Amino acid sequence: MEKTINIALCEARHQMPECVTGAIYPNTVDPLDIAGITETADVFMREHSGDVVNVYVTGLTVCTIAVVKAALMLLATESARPRTLTLWHFDRATGDYYPQTIIYGKEENAVGEAILYYAYNC
């Protein structure tokens, strides 16, 4: 059953909207541990196959890239995939978050839809 997951990228790094529950990574992450960062992202994306995933980006580019890569690898290689992956970035001017949709897939042609969506909307 499809769920909507609202999660921070890294725990307790910034103020989060009330809808956010939990984080993919702990507050302290070793940015040089690419293998560990990648494994965490892979496990998270597999656990949320079929879900609408909203990630509130709270720092560490290396972690953001690992999450996007994990989702795209699932799209390219397996039937398990997030239904939607949207990154939410903080706007200092407004104090709100704004979306960047990375994957928007419905059913069978999710890879093609994701590529076309990204190419024309990003």
Which residue ranges define each predicted feature?
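Long, low-complexity, Lys/Arg-enriched
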Residues: 1-54, 66-122
